[in-house]
UniProtKB/Swiss-Prot annotation:
Gene name of this polypeptide: rnb
This protein's name: Exoribonuclease 2
Family label: Belongs to the RNR ribonuclease family. RNase II subfamily.
Class of enzymatic activity (EC top level): hydrolase
UniProt organism field: Salmonella newport (strain SL254)
Segments forming domain S1 motif: 561-643
């Protein structure tokens, strides 16, 4: 009799609309209960039985119950699941399989089965890619997943690489494909094979993108010719190889090995500017005045070159610093190094005064054994030879940015607009408290930004610099010319790494159109989005593999008294993050390790400081000694404590 009663339906509707609800993200804890985080200030308790319906990270709507003045959340509707596609470790065997997601806060095994068409017979310990198929908040009885791809077996030494690449859905190997012959592009190539071009790279580099040649003119000015490998001489736009490169967007450099954007036959051989091999190149010739200014008379042209020497950064640096035993093989090569060194010094000086120069940070290189074991991690400082190449590349990219802007009005540009305008007032206020006075309007201009950066670089420590970093905007890839505040330049378009960056291949095609005086279409916007997304994924993959290798490397130091110098890079409510100076590993120091009495301890992310009893004891950029307390292999996290 109540079945179709409109009054009852109305009452139900009323009760439903009057029941308080909240939307937020589920945060799990290790104790079985959880919280619904609505915003930074408000969260609701989720009791353990209700947590069985949801997963850490799910965005849900929950009904809020109040009992004895205690609020709790009952999950009601799924807005966005945290897990869709994920990687994990398989448990069980044959017909009763489950998978534990590889995530620090997801500990529960999810029942699963092999998806249709997946031939592999899964067993305990296998790594797999899975996709969620059922969720309790979608009316299903429980969570359930399909195993869509086998990654590797439990004891594979290369688990960090294969699992990370599968997690980010990135390619595991070089693309297939061959380029049989060079295209007829209708370009006149200048024969520069007689000139003493040299390449300077790491000793192990095979994909040499750039060769340099310098000469002194009669009036004392220096002329620099930058010759860049020419993959677009082999790869036609829209071809299969081109489309593959477009999807990959970059060569993916991981510790221990790389996954190239182009087939290795091209990247490491046909296009690589190997010593004593004749190669096609795209070249830029510029004249540099004594003060480092680049003359307006910039020439881009197609060429044929033959590198006369494959030089290594360390050898060249040692020679310029009068160290070591290495010598250039002849006077011609020695003269090239001297001239390139002069260009480097004058360009560096120019950038100090008219643009911005990054502080040198070391690169960390993993030395790996046959089985992927970490034998050592070496900090490689950026030396004078690295700077010679860097200054030449920045100059060449600045030239390309100008030419593409003036001749076409578009290209693939790296654009960075400095500070987000919404943050300008807060930034000025923060700087004022530290005795630096800036105009909130002026700091949004390229000149104002450069002026501030120079003042910050002159500070005794990097503390203030670290505080304002959160106000900065991110660098973007754009088809529209625009300034690059981070470099302090009016425009910046890279074309010097076409073997490893698809955007540089596009700029090559645009520059060739300029050389031939032909019209060419503006690149599609979606390509810049693809490049930005791939750059993000590649960086995450590099970080994930690094975390895994750092955990392996430091595992035997856990619980020992071995001390490491560590720079504080971040402070949060829960503690501090530090970077070990000698090897680059990131470790976390939990707040209880800083001071035992919680009420006397204030960890402020806002100020970048840790105070004990009102005294600032630690701040971001401080370097302190730490020991390794614990290494958690399953989450690849390193826990440190201040050394006693």
């Amino acid at each position: 009799m109540f079945q179709d009663n409109p009054l009852l339906a109305q009452l139900k509707q009323q009760l439903h609309s009057q029941t308080p609800r909240a939307e937020g993200v589920v945060k799990a804890t290790e104790k079985g209960f959880g919280f619904l985080e609505v915003d930074a200030q408000k969260s609701y308790f989720i009791p353990p039985p209700q947590m069985k319906k949801v997963m850490h990270g799910d965005r849900i709507v929950a009904v809020i119950h109040t009992e004895k003045e205690r609020e709790s959340a009952e999950p009601e509707e799924l807005i966005e699941p945290f897990l869709t596609r994920f990687v994990g470790k398989v448990q069980g065997k044959n017909d009763r399989l489950s998978i534990v997601p590889d995530h620090p806060l997801l500990k529960d095994a999810i029942p699963c089965r092999a998806a249709r068409g997946v031939q592999h017979e899964f067993k305990e310990g296998d790594w797999a890619v899975a996709e969620m198929r059922r969720h309790p908040l979608k009316g299903d009885r429980s969570f359930y997943a399909d195993l869509t791809q086998y990654i590797t077996f439990a004891d594979d030494h290369f688990v960090p690489w294969w699992v990370t690449l599968a997690r980010h859905n990135l390619e595991k190997e070089a693309p297939n494909g061959v380029a049989t012959e060079m295209l007829d592009e209708g370009l006149e190539r200048q024969d520069l094979t007689a000139l003493n071009f040299v390449t300077i790279d790491s000793a192990s580099t095979e994909d040499m993108d750039d060769a340099l040649y310098a000469e002194e003119l009669a009036d004392g000015r220096l002329q620099l010719t930058v010759a860049i490998a020419d993959p677009t001489a082999w790869i036609a736009e829209g071809s299969k190889l081109d489309n593959t490169a477009k999807i990959r967007a970059f060569t993916n450099y991981l510790p221990g090995f790389n996954i190239p954007m182009l087939p290795r036959e091209l990247s490491d051989d046909l296009c690589s500017l190997r010593a004593n091999e004749v190669r096609p190149a795209l070249a830029c010739r510029m004249i540099i005045a004594a003060d480092g200014t680049i003359d307006d008379d910039i020439a881009f042209f197609a060429a044929t070159i033959e590198s006369k020497a494959k030089l290594a950064y360390d050898n060249v640096s040692d020679w310029l610093e009068n160290n070591g035993t290495w010598q250039p093989e002849n006077e011609d090569i020695a003269q090239q190094i001297r001239l390139l060194h002069r260009i480097c010094l004058s360009r560096s000086e120019w950038r100090h005064h008219h643009a911005l120069v990054f502080k040198d940070r070391p690169d960390y290189r993993f030395v790996l054994g046959e089985k992927g074991e970490v034998l050592d991690i070496v900090a490689e400082p950026r030396r004078i030879a690295n700077r010679i190449v860097e200054e030449s590349m920045i100059a060449a990219n600045l030239c390309a940015a100008r030419v593409l802007r003036d001749k076409l009005g578009f290209g693939i540009y790296n654009v960075h607009t400095g500070f987000d305008p919404a943050n300008a007032d807060a930034l000025a206020a923060l700087l004022k408290t530290h005795g630096l006075h800036v105009d909130a309007e002026e700091v949004l201009t390229l000149e104002g930004f450069c002026k501030l950066r120079r003042e910050l670089d002159a500070q005794p420590s990097g503390f203030l610099d670290s505080r304002i970093r959160r106000f900065q905007s991110f660098a973007e890839i754009s088809t529209e010319p625009g300034p690059h505040f981070g470099l302090g330049l009016e425009a910046y378009a890279t074309w010097t790494s076409p073997i490893r960056k698809y955007g540089d291949m596009i700029n090559h095609r645009l520059l060739k159109a300029v050389i031939k005086g032909e019209a060419i279409a503006r690149p599609q916007e979606d390509i810049t989005q693809q490049m930005a997304e791939r750059r993000r994924l590649n960086r995450m993959a590099e970080r994930d593999v690094g975390d895994w290798l750092y955990a392996r490397f430091l595992n035997d130091k856990a619980g020992t008294n071995t001390r490491f110098a560590a720079e504080i890079i971040d402070v949060s409510r829960g503690g501090m993050r530090v970077r070990l100076v000698d090897n680059g590993a990131i470790a976390f120091i939990p707040a209880p390790f800083l001071h035992a009495v919680r009420d006397e301890l204030v960890c402020s992310q806002e100020n970048g400081t840790v105070q004990i009893k009102g005294e600032t004891v630690y701040k971001v950029t401080d370097v302190i000694d730490v020991t390794i307390a614990e290494v958690r292999m399953e989450t690849r996290s390193i826990i440190a404590r201040p050394a006693a």
